[in-house]
Design a protein with these regions (language model features):
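Flexible "cap/lid" loop of the alpha/beta hydrolase fold
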Residues: 1-11
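Short glycine/proline- and acidic residue-enriched helix-loop micro-motifs
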Residues: 21-34
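Active-site nucleophile elbow and catalytic-triad environment of alpha/beta-hydrolase enzymes
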Residues: 36-53
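Short, conserved loop/helix-junction motifs that constitute active-site signature segments
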Residues: 54-58, 83-86
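Short beta-strand/loop motif that positions the catalytic acidic residue
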Residues: 57, 63-65, 69
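Conserved alpha/beta-hydrolase "acid-adjacent" motif
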Residues: 70-76
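Catalytic active-site module of serine/aspartate enzymes centered on a nucleophile-bearing elbow/loop
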Residues: 90-127
Length: 127
């Protein structure tokens, strides 16, 4: 990412091989296999802004992260949870599902975990 602005004229797109396995639900696998290199400059700026403003987040937060995610760093959930000021926060760790985990074989499990987390957060707020 740091050299994206210099690379953009010579390498217009950052691309990767589409994942070919049973991790994603085929009916919903409309993922992308690349993005414009110049967008990486914006992405880097947005990540920096987001990290600097995590302290403003006070609502319940459940981070969902997979060991199979090749897009984000393994410490991303920890960075987020350490930065937010939420009273109610947690992490749902998945194994071997890709970045777009909501359309993976874990989709139903994620939906159930989110429902449980936010119901418990609401009950906690009422108490």
């Amino acid at each position: 990412f740091p050299l994206a602005r210099f690379a953009a004229p010579f390498l217009p797109e950052i691309s990767w091989q589409a994942r070919k396995d049973d991790a994603l639900t085929p009916d919903y696998d409309l993922g992308y296999t690349g993005f414009p290199t110049k967008s990486a400059v914006d992405l880097r700026r947005i990540i920096h802004e987001a990290r600097n403003n995590l302290c403003a987040v006070t609502c319940p937060v459940l981070c969902v992260q997979s060991s199979g995610d090749q897009v984000i760093t393994p410490d991303s959930a920890d960075v987020i949870l350490q930065g937010v000021q939420s009273k109610t926060k947690g992490v749902l760790r998945l194994k071997n599902v890709p970045h777009v985990c909501t359309i993976s074989r874990e989709g139903a499990h994620i939906a159930q975990a989110l429902g449980t987390f936010f119901r418990e957060a609401e009950e906690s707020e009422r108490a």
